[in-house]
């Protein structure tokens, strides 16, 4: 079990952090509780990552909805790393902009623009129609662009 959690933790942490923001750790913990409780119900081991992604997104949205968002504390971002070197001020600006969006908008941006899921894949994961994903993505991108002040 420890190896499984270690393997999944970076991805789950990234998804939960992007959607639940400062409550990302809570969402990650809830995700792993749900995964460990329900692992026996997973019929197809090859589907593990998709199954965990679905749980992580849903838990992150639930946690984000359940609590008031606190302003992003820049000191919580110090340990962040990325593939491409980026300015910490930009990271803070992006997180602050994301904090102004609804959890569902953050989720669709993460799934489509960060994870690169297709409309159909995102729709299946979120349990909505592909057209709904398309309209939500448009609204989320528009809302992000309106709030973005680099």
Predicted regions and their residues:
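A short, charge-rich alpha-helical start-of-domain segment used by transcription regulators
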Residues: 1-14, 21, 36
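Short helix-capping/turn signature of helix-turn-helix
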Residues: 7-10, 18-19, 110-118
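Residues within the DNA-recognition helix of helix-turn-helix
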Residues: 8, 136-139, 143
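Short, small-hydrophobic-rich alpha-helical interface motif
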Residues: 12, 16, 24-35, 122, ...
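Arg/Lys-rich amphipathic alpha helix in sigma70-family domain 2
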Residues: 37-44, 54-74, 87
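Acidic, proline/glycine-rich intrinsically disordered inter-domain spacer in sigma factors
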Residues: 67-99
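C-terminal edge and immediately downstream basic/flexible tail or linker adjoining helix-turn-helix-like DNA-binding
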Residues: 78, 93, 124-125, 142-150
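Helix-turn-helix DNA-binding module
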Residues: 99, 103, 107, 115-132, ...
